[in-house]
Design a protein with these regions (language model features):
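Short, Lys/Arg-enriched N-terminal segments with co-localized hydrophobic residues
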Residues: 1-5
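Mg2+-dependent prenyl diphosphate-binding active-site environment of isoprenoid biosynthetic enzymes
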Residues: 18, 22-286, 294-304
């Protein structure tokens, strides 16, 4: 049984804000300078990343690393920036007219709405590639053979979970099935890849760079899968029940696009119940891991109850 030392919500929220501010500074330090003939692409990239967001993926990465080492290893920081760039690139492409056709993102005009559809495509591409350039900087932070291997493995995880067997694979099935009925097994597949894969990457990279044993990495991946699924179901719930001002994006976007979601298949009540079950199972997984990171436990709990 863990001792609750951060049960006070105000303490947690202050801590969360401080950690997100630090992450924003770290991400900022890797963003390109807006100069040269191609400065428009730099502006569009930076606009997309600076639009805000919860910074969940870098947060998960550093907190899982902290679980195994008690601190955030320097090699983790470039990966934290990289995963947020990849996540942002997926949002930039998601909003395009040929995809979800959304004009708003994170409370501002979406990237294509601000810079044009052509720049929206290029900015998404640029962020995804630049992310790997940034991640590779982690090699400069380590010198031991084992640590160098870990950085190599982390890059492999990042690529696999972003690409055809991960996020892009999930988006492919999502696009192909949009506008028509989607069977539950395919919806689970889409969620596991489209949302789950990057959350798995963030936690797994944190574990690998934190020197976690193989069996612990498996638990981390299982934990991340549950958090990812719960997160996406909550997203579906908020699309039905949420307030556009709070969400910072168009509520009812799923209905507008006639999208099958967890809520349309299972109903609102069952969806809410499943989110609670998944989060409880995720906390169980977390409790199997060494170390104690109560902040991470609170973060998982609060995410499930989020309103945006």
């Amino acid at each position: 049984v863990r001792v609750k030392t951060m049960s006070d919500n105000t303490v947690f929220k202050t801590e969360l804000e401080e950690r997100i501010n630090k992450i924003n500074e770290q991400i900022e330090s890797y963003l390109p300078e807006e100069k040269g003939h191609q400065s428009t692409i730099f502006e569009a990239m930076n606009y997309s990343v600076r639009a805000g967001g919860k910074r969940l993926r870098p947060l998960f990465m550093q907190e899982i690393c902290r679980l195994f080492t008690g601190e955030v290893q320097p090699a983790v920081v470039p990966f934290m920036a990289a995963i947020e760039m990849i996540h942002t690139s997926s949002l930039v492409h998601d909003d395009l007219p040929c995809m979800d056709d959304d004009m708003m993102r994170r409370g501002k005009a979406s990237t294509w709405a601000e810079y044009g559809e052509d720049m929206g495509v290029l900015a998404g591409d640029a962020l995804m590639i630049y992310a790997f350039e940034v991640a590779a900087k982690a090699f400069n932070e380590v010198s031991e053979a084992d640590d160098l291997k870990r950085v190599g493995r982390a890059i492999e995880i990042l690529a696999a979970k972003t690409g055809i067997y991960g996020m892009i694979g999930g988006q492919t099935v999502d696009v192909e099935l949009s506008g028509g009925p989607v069977p539950k097994n395919k919806l689970d597949f889409i969620y596991r890849l489209k949302t789950g894969a990057l959350i798995e990457a963030s936690m797994l990279i944190g574990a690998v760079l934190g020197g976690a044993a193989e069996e612990d990495c498996k638990i981390v991946e299982s934990l991340a899968g549950k958090v990812g699924l719960a997160f996406q179901i909550q997203d579906d719930i908020l699309d039905v029940t949420g307030d556009q001002k709070v969400l910072g994006k168009e509520a009812g976007s799923d209905e507008k696009n006639q999208k099958t979601t967890y809520v349309t298949i299972e109903g609102l009540e069952k969806a809410k119940k499943d989110v609670e079950i998944l989060s409880a199972q995720a906390i169980e997984d977390l409790n199997k891991l060494p170390g104690n990171n109560e902040f991470l436990e609170n973060l998982i709990r609060i995410l499930i109850k989020r309103q945006k």
